[in-house]
């Protein structure tokens, strides 16, 4: 589990993708240590620091985990690509809700896991990523996931 990094991205309301605007900030939490990273913008320097941070907290290729990976991963991948930085997550990601639905054998139960968050979901991306990491810890413990 030491390769898991939980990520949350924020963008202005109505901004659905990098084609229509810019990410305003993002947060990441290392699953095992709960070390965090706060990207306060989407500049080249921030993405370089994020790349270095991810590589420092994970052995081998990091695994991108998110509440909504279709949304969050597109932003992170876009800015890594924009600045010519190799994405430390590669071209894949994992969604907590889909994993949880599979564990419960209930295809449509993709959000009840959110009740397991401890840190309040307040759209501060570090807090949101931390809450998701906390919930994932509980899911793994309850289901004896290795």
Model-derived segments and spans:
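Metal-dependent phosphoesterase core characteristic of DEDDh/y 3'-5' exonuclease domains
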Residues: 2-4, 21-24, 30-38, 51-146
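Short acidic, Gly/Ser-rich segments with clustered Asp/Glu that frequently serve as metal-coordination loops
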Residues: 9-18
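A conditional alpha-helix N-cap/helix-loop micro-motif detector
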Residues: 40-47
């Amino acid at each position: 589990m030491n390769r898991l990094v939980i990520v949350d991205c924020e963008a202005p309301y109505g901004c659905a993708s990098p084609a229509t605007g810019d990410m305003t900030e993002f947060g990441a939490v290392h699953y095992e240590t709960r070390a965090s990273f706060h990207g306060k913008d989407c500049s080249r320097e921030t993405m370089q620091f994020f790349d270095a941070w991810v590589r420092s907290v994970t052995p081998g290729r990091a695994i991108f985990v998110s509440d909504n990976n279709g949304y969050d991963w597109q932003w992170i991948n876009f800015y890594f690509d924009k600045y010519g930085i190799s994405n430390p997550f590669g071209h894949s990601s994992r969604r907590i809700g889909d994993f949880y639905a599979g564990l419960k054998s209930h295809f449509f139960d993709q959000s009840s896991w959110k009740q397991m968050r401890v840190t309040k979901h307040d759209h501060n991306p570090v807090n949101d990523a931390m809450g998701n990491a906390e919930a994932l810890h509980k899911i793994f413990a309850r289901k004896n996931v290795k």
